[in-house]
């Protein structure tokens, strides 16, 4: 008799995706982040569900309801901080996952890559709306500043912003709809994850060498299930350390002040994981130009397959490209730092130079370096 996991219609899908899936034998720990992102998503949905049971999306009671969760609900404080810091872990894993894709040329699988970029946008939208919900000072002013950027769109901008706000300013209608969308989007993300995996399993995983590994595959279980469990353990250890020892390390103290439309905080800034894009936005003196640069800073990932000029897929054997890749990482860290600084000298000029370098590296220097490496290999 055939094993039930190979014959049952539902178990067969799970078996082909998680148990008998052929995987390259050489994939390193950089391939762990897909499963870690899945765990992050599960943590966020579960903690978010329980938080939603106690949260009220009304401007008069939202801030109090979050305080009530932390003080009066059994283990409410741990739910709240798991959710807040879980978002940070989510983005750390996301950035490392995308970075791995760039380094090892995973973007050659266009369908998987494009769904991944859509996922990145969806997660960023979800995180932004979630940051508005506690209705602190930074929530309110962050929502005001970021939604107001849409007014830079010619002709329809102002109408679009008022339509999103549900009025003439960020108010009760805005908070209610942001809560509704913040609850809905993770389930859309879950569906997109399925599509992402569907496309990935059409081609199979890439590997560090970038060379097809069809002749050297091993079953996903037990080798990579054990490996993923180790990665999950490490991530949960970091997350719990953050939650239990310094839960507010990555947050903004201003968000412990209830939202006040009459009092603007001295430095309006988003959560740390948006700072690099915020720095690019601020470095351009023109509003529409800034908004375009902000969107393009992430949308640029879509054109990565077109910018691939190397004859090798991975950067593993391309030392010049490796140098530029790590320069890009350093540049993104610089932008993240600048995004959290006030708009004054010398931070303005550093931000502008870092923004120019970011686009220059991706659009010009990396493709040219790949062509140079192709010629060097001929010798």
Curated annotation (Swiss-Prot):
<dbReference type="InterPro" id="IPR016174">
    <property type="entry name" value="Di-haem_cyt_TM"/>
</dbReference>
<feature type="transmembrane region" description="Helical">
    <location>
        <begin position="288"/>
        <end position="308"/>
    </location>
</feature>
<keyword id="KW-0408">Iron</keyword>
<dbReference type="InterPro" id="IPR005797">
    <property type="entry name" value="Cyt_b/b6_N"/>
</dbReference>
<feature type="transmembrane region" description="Helical">
    <location>
        <begin position="178"/>
        <end position="198"/>
    </location>
</feature>
<dbReference type="InterPro" id="IPR048259">
    <property type="entry name" value="Cytochrome_b_N_euk/bac"/>
</dbReference>
<dbReference type="InterPro" id="IPR048260">
    <property type="entry name" value="Cytochrome_b_C_euk/bac"/>
</dbReference>
<keyword id="KW-1133">Transmembrane helix</keyword>
<dbReference type="GO" id="GO:0046872">
    <property type="term" value="F:metal ion binding"/>
</dbReference>
<dbReference type="InterPro" id="IPR005798">
    <property type="entry name" value="Cyt_b/b6_C"/>
</dbReference>
<dbReference type="InterPro" id="IPR027387">
    <property type="entry name" value="Cytb/b6-like_sf"/>
</dbReference>
<keyword id="KW-0249">Electron transport</keyword>
<keyword id="KW-0472">Membrane</keyword>
<feature type="transmembrane region" description="Helical">
    <location>
        <begin position="347"/>
        <end position="367"/>
    </location>
</feature>
<feature type="transmembrane region" description="Helical">
    <location>
        <begin position="226"/>
        <end position="246"/>
    </location>
</feature>
<dbReference type="Pfam" id="PF00032">
    <property type="entry name" value="Cytochrom_B_C"/>
</dbReference>
<comment type="function">
    <text>Component of the ubiquinol-cytochrome c reductase complex (complex III or cytochrome b-c1 complex) that is part of the mitochondrial respiratory chain. The b-c1 complex mediates electron transfer from ubiquinol to cytochrome c. Contributes to the generation of a proton gradient across the mitochondrial membrane that is then used for ATP synthesis.</text>
</comment>
<feature type="transmembrane region" description="Helical">
    <location>
        <begin position="77"/>
        <end position="98"/>
    </location>
</feature>
<dbReference type="Pfam" id="PF00033">
    <property type="entry name" value="Cytochrome_B"/>
</dbReference>
<dbReference type="GO" id="GO:0005743">
    <property type="term" value="C:mitochondrial inner membrane"/>
</dbReference>
<dbReference type="GO" id="GO:0008121">
    <property type="term" value="F:ubiquinol-cytochrome-c reductase activity"/>
</dbReference>
<feature type="transmembrane region" description="Helical">
    <location>
        <begin position="320"/>
        <end position="340"/>
    </location>
</feature>
<keyword id="KW-0812">Transmembrane</keyword>
<keyword id="KW-0830">Ubiquinone</keyword>
<dbReference type="GO" id="GO:0006122">
    <property type="term" value="P:mitochondrial electron transport, ubiquinol to cytochrome c"/>
</dbReference>
<dbReference type="GO" id="GO:0045275">
    <property type="term" value="C:respiratory chain complex III"/>
</dbReference>
<feature type="binding site">
    <location>
        <position position="201"/>
    </location>
    <ligand>
        <name>a ubiquinone</name>
    </ligand>
</feature>
<keyword id="KW-0679">Respiratory chain</keyword>
<feature type="transmembrane region" description="Helical">
    <location>
        <begin position="113"/>
        <end position="133"/>
    </location>
</feature>
<keyword id="KW-0349">Heme</keyword>
<comment type="subunit">
    <text>The cytochrome bc1 complex contains 11 subunits: 3 respiratory subunits (MT-CYB, CYC1 and UQCRFS1), 2 core proteins (UQCRC1 and UQCRC2) and 6 low-molecular weight proteins (UQCRH/QCR6, UQCRB/QCR7, UQCRQ/QCR8, UQCR10/QCR9, UQCR11/QCR10 and a cleavage product of UQCRFS1). This cytochrome bc1 complex then forms a dimer.</text>
</comment>
<comment type="similarity">
    <text>Belongs to the cytochrome b family.</text>
</comment>
<dbReference type="InterPro" id="IPR036150">
    <property type="entry name" value="Cyt_b/b6_C_sf"/>
</dbReference>
<feature type="binding site" description="axial binding residue">
    <location>
        <position position="97"/>
    </location>
    <ligand>
        <name>heme b b566</name>
    </ligand>
</feature>
<keyword id="KW-0479">Metal-binding</keyword>
<keyword id="KW-0813">Transport</keyword>
<keyword id="KW-0496">Mitochondrion</keyword>
<feature type="binding site" description="axial binding residue">
    <location>
        <position position="182"/>
    </location>
    <ligand>
        <name>heme b b562</name>
    </ligand>
</feature>
<dbReference type="InterPro" id="IPR030689">
    <property type="entry name" value="Cytochrome_b"/>
</dbReference>
<feature type="binding site" description="axial binding residue">
    <location>
        <position position="83"/>
    </location>
    <ligand>
        <name>heme b b562</name>
    </ligand>
</feature>
<feature type="transmembrane region" description="Helical">
    <location>
        <begin position="33"/>
        <end position="53"/>
    </location>
</feature>
<keyword id="KW-0999">Mitochondrion inner membrane</keyword>
């Amino acid at each position: 008799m055939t094993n039930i996991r190979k014959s049952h219609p539902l178990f067969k899908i799970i078996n082909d995706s998680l148990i008998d899936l052929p995987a390259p034998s050489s994939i390193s720990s950089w391939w762990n982040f897909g499963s870690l992102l899945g765990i992050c998503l599960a943590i966020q949905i579960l903690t978010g569900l329980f938080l939603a049971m106690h949260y009220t999306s009304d401007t008069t009671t939202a801030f109090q309801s979050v305080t009530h969760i932390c003080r009066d609900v059994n283990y409410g404080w741990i739910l709240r901080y798991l959710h807040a810091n879980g978002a940070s872990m989510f983005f750390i894993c996301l950035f490392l996952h995308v970075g791995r894709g760039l380094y090892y040329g995973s973007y050659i699988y266009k369908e998987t890559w494009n769904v991944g970029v859509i996922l990145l946008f969806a997660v960023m939208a979800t995180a932004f709306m979630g940051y508005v919900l506690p209705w602190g000072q930074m929530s309110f002013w962050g929502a005001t500043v970021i939604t107001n950027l849409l007014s830079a769109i010619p002709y329809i901008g102002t109408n679009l912003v008022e339509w999103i706000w549900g009025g003439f300013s960020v108010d009760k209608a805005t908070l209610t709809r942001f809560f509704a969308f913040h609850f809905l989007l993770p389930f859309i993300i879950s569906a997109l994850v399925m599509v992402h995996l569907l496309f990935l399993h059409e081609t199979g995983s890439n590997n560090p060498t970038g060379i097809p590994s069809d002749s050297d595959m091993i079953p996903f279980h037990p080798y990579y299930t054990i490996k993923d469990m180790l990665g999950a353990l490490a991530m949960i250890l970091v997350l719990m350390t953050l939650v239990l020892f310094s839960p507010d390390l990555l947050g903004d103290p201003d968000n412990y002040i209830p939202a006040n439309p009459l009092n603007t905080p001295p430095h309006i800034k988003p959560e740390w994981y948006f700072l690099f894009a915020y720095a690019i936005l601020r470095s351009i003196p023109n509003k529409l130009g800034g908004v375009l640069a902000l969107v393009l800073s992430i949308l640029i990932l879509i054109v990565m397959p077109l910018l691939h000029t190397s004859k090798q897929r991975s950067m593993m054997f391309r030392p010049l490209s490796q140098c530029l890749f790590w320069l890009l990482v350093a540049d993104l860290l610089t932008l993240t730092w600048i995004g959290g600084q006030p708009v004054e000298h010398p931070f303005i000029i550093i931000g502008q130079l870092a923004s120019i370098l970011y686009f220059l590296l991706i659009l010009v220097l990396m493709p040219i370096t790949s062509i140079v490496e192709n010629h060097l290999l001929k010798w």
